[in-house]
Amino acid sequence: MISIILVMIGGGFGAIARSAITDYFNHKFTSKLPIATLIVNLVGSFLIGLTIGLSISTSWFPAFFVTGFLGGLTTFSTLAKELTLMMTPKFNINLFLNYSLLQFIIGFIACYIGYHI
C-alpha cells in the first residue's frame, strides 16, 4: 500500500514539473517541433537510465522517483497527440519523421548513457 501512495505522490510532482517545464519552453521558444515534450522525455529517459544504472534500490525510491516522478514527468500520451496533430492537410513527413526519431532513438540513447555513467 505504501508503494501506491509513493507512486501517487511522485507522479503528482512529476506532472507538476512537466507542466512547469512545458509552460516555460512554450513561452520562450517557437518551433515547429514540440520542444517541451522532447526535453521532458529525453531528460526523463536519461534519469531512468541513471537510476537503474546506479542501482538505487531503497525500498521506497524506485516507486516514488522512477515510477512516480519520472512517470509523471515523461509523457507518451502527449507525444502521441503531437504526432497525430502533425498529420494535417499540410502534413510534413520530414518533420513527423524527425520528431519521431528524436523522441524514440535519442530517448533510448539518453537512457543508455544514463545507465552507463
From Swiss-Prot:
Primary subcellular site in the record, as a coarse category: membrane
Subcellular location: Cell membrane
Transmembrane segments: 1-21, 33-53, 60-80, 95-115
Gene Ontology MF, one: metal ion binding
Membrane topology term: Multi-pass membrane protein
Domain of life from the UniProt record: Bacteria
InterPro entries reported in the protein's UniProt record: FluC
Reported regulation of activity: Na(+) is not transported, but it plays an essential structural role and its presence is essential for fluoride channel function.
Reaction(s) catalysed by this chain's protein: fluoride(in) = fluoride(out)
Chain sites annotated for binding Na(+): 71, 74
GO CC terms: plasma membrane
Pfam annotation, one family: CRCB
One annotated GO biological process: cellular detoxification of fluoride
Keywords on record: Cell membrane, Ion channel, Ion transport, Membrane, Metal-binding, Sodium, Transmembrane, Transmembrane helix, Transport
PANTHER family the record matches: FLUORIDE EXPORT PROTEIN 1-RELATED, FLUORIDE-SPECIFIC ION CHANNEL FLUC 2
Similarity comment text for this entry: Belongs to the fluoride channel Fluc/FEX (TC 1.A.43) family.
Protein's job: Fluoride-specific ion channel. Important for reducing fluoride concentration in the cell, thus reducing its toxicity.
The protein's name: Fluoride-specific ion channel FluC 2
Organism: Staphylococcus aureus (strain COL)
Source lineage: Bacteria, Bacillati, Bacillota, Bacilli, Bacillales
